[in-house]
Design a protein with these regions (language model features):
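Phosphate-coordination loops involved in phosphoryl transfer and adenosine-cofactor binding
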Residues: 11-16, 121-123, 231
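Rossmann-like adenosine-cofactor binding region
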Residues: 169-249
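Phosphate/diphosphate ligand-binding glycine-rich loop within oxidoreductases
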Residues: 5, 11-114, 242
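Short hydrophobic/aromatic-enriched beta-strand-loop microsegments
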Residues: 92-97, 149, 258-259
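Adenosine-phosphate binding glycine-rich loop
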Residues: 231-232, 238-277
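Glycine-rich phosphate/diphosphate-binding loop of Rossmann-like nucleotide-binding domains
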Residues: 21-33, 117-196
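Short, small-residue-biased leader/transition segments that mark boundaries at the very start
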Residues: 1-2
Length: 277
């Protein structure tokens, strides 16, 4: 058993290379702090530090980095870059985020829900907003643990069909269900968890104003969450665009666990690094 008052240098002498083609506050700080607390070192590589897939192939970069590092964490746009890096690297590769998936975040979310609700199976999880990488990872993760997953997005912004189909298979096996609906009230009704994310992700800034018009009825506000259970918890992967996808009255309410959720990124990612490195 690990104790908070003790240090656990399980990664002493190990080095994590952190590749960011997409900048992030929480991902960099939580991984860099985490590897340090475990006795290792984190090395940051920004968009201009590596020639990933440009003047050097991803395969060659993976092979070279494998000679220097103990592990790689990559946060990037194309999911194929992570897959190719993992294919050719001889060291562990951790997906810090892609346009398709955000696995470290959903593991954190499941841990946070378990912490707050003391169970996962049978809970109703309502995700309101863009059918983006966060929605995809929620479908993957929550369906595997037997949660009833409701995703509410406007037409044209629903999650990837292949991912939805896989989630339905998981749900059938676990005896739960997955529902995709355009009605946010249906999704939130009697929900144990209400979750949202930004309406325009990084790289979609030019679409932001158009998206606001289409997503306004998907704002998480007091009128919407009154349909959830009284003891629901509100979650957001952050950063939040307050006044858009969520209002202060919800984000700062007693039901909100967003800052516990943010802290848990550190603990969950330490566990991931300790497991694979």
């Amino acid at each position: 058993m690990l104790f908070r008052s003790r240090t656990h240098k399980v990664l002493e002498g190990k080095t994590l290379g952190m590749i960011f083609t997409k900048p992030s506050t929480r991902t960099r700080i939580s991984f860099e702090t985490g590897i340090y607390q475990l006795g290792g070192i984190g090395m940051y590589f920004g968009p201009n530090d590596l020639q990933l897939g440009k003047s050097e192939s991803v395969a060659d970069t993976a092979k070279v980095l494998s000679r220097y590092l103990s592990g790689i964490m990559i946060r990037t746009f194309a999911h194929s870059d992570v897959e190719e890096l993992a294919k050719y690297a001889s060291i562990p590769v951790i997906n810090g985020l892609t346009d398709l998936l955000h696995p470290c975040q959903v593991l954190t979310d499941l841990f946070t829900i378990l912490e707050k609700k003391k169970q996962l199976r049978g809970l109703k999880f309502a995700y309101i907003g863009d059918g983006n990488n966060m929605a995809h990872s929620i479908l993957h993760g929550c369906s595997k643990v037997g949660m009833n997953v409701y995703i509410s997005s406007p037409s044209g912004y629903t999650p990837n069909e292949v991912i939805v189909n896989n989630a339905n298979k998981n749900a059938a096996y676990m005896g739960s269900k997955v529902v995709i609906t355009e009605d946010p009230i249906e999704a939130v009704k009697d929900a144990d968890i209400v979750y949202t994310d930004v309406w325009a992700s990084m790289g979609q800034e030019k679409e932001a104003e158009e998206r606001k018009k289409k997503f306004i009825r998907y704002q998480v506000n007091p009128e919407l969450v009154k349909n959830a259970k009284a003891d629901y918890i509100f979650m957001h992967c952050l950063p939040a665009h307050r006044g858009d996808e969520v209002v202060n009255e919800v984000a700062d309410s007693v039901n909100s666990v967003i800052f516990d959720e943010a802290e848990n990124r550190l603990h969950v990612q330490k566990a991931i690094m300790a497991l694979v490195m």
